[in-house]
Amino acid sequence: MCDQLSQFVVDKYVHLKDFLAKESCAELTAELKRLVAEKQTTQDSQCPKSEAVHGAMAFDKLLVDLLPHFERASGRRLYPTYSYARLYAPGEDLTIHTDRPSCEISATLTLGFEGDVWPIYMGDEGKANANKIDMVVGGAVLYRGMDKHHWRETYTEGK
């Protein structure tokens, strides 16, 4: 069993470093900022300070393009359900939670940021014994969304 698959099976998540090319990340970041500028985004109750978009064409395409890579890392046949992109604002946090059934296996990718790295945390039972994962541009975490508690502390940097 490959290292990524082993980690996913045992830990219920795998950190995929250098997963997406920096050029692709820059293009997708520019697309998200364009959607924000054109007011094609919204806020949600989970992160009300931030702008988000559900089902944008560029991110839906990314979901399909990355599917085979996520299937290899998880050892499972996966069915894409939806894409969701968010431009986090300073002062935002992501409250500890698990995901709904349509997010049985989820991925988070970092496409761009200003300032310091903003980690995501993965834990089994709340915040005790959680793992901090530094998310750099091009990095991803594939995880069992209904099983892994995940969150981000307050974001103090730029966007």
Where are these regions (language model features)?
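Secondary-structure boundary/capping signal
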Residues: 24, 40, 77-78, 93, ...
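A short coil-to-beta-strand element that immediately follows conserved catalytic motifs
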Residues: 75-84
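Non-heme Fe(II)/2-oxoglutarate
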Residues: 1-74
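Generic beta-strand or strand-like secondary-structure segments
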Residues: 65-69, 84, 106
